[in-house]
Amino acid sequence: MKISVAMAYYNGGMYIEEQMDTILTQLGAQDEVIVSVDGASDGSKPLLLKMAEEDKRIHVIKGPGKGVVKNFENAIRHCSGEIIYLSDQDDIWKPDKV
């Protein structure tokens, strides 16, 4: 069963590396993380794009620019998994979440 993680992202550079590590270790090769970027004025977008280049499970998409709820809705619309987890941009996942 394919798992999708939907993330609404806005200036989360301070947390993104640790967060992705805690998420990706729990996902299989067929799973995905959809990151809807509503803004990254903290300079973190290049880091996100590099992470997506290095791990094909990460997909970075343009956010709608209309707040966190619309940004989550955008991420969810792009998910293709049977199970969808939501992740705020500063979540650190416990090892047994998935």
Placement of each model-derived feature along the sequence:
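Cell-envelope/extracellular polymer assembly enzymes that use nucleotide-activated donors
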Residues: 2-4, 32
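Short, well-formed alpha-helical segments that are part of the catalytic scaffolds
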Residues: 11-25
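A conserved acidic beta->alpha catalytic loop
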Residues: 37-46
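Active-site acidic Asp-centered loop
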Residues: 38, 87-89
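Acidic donor-binding/catalytic loop of UDP-sugar-dependent glycosyltransferases
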Residues: 43, 91-98
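Glycine-rich, basic loop-to-helix element that forms the pyrophosphate-binding segment
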Residues: 63-79
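Short aromatic/hydrophobic "clamp" motif used to bind/position activated sugar donors
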Residues: 84
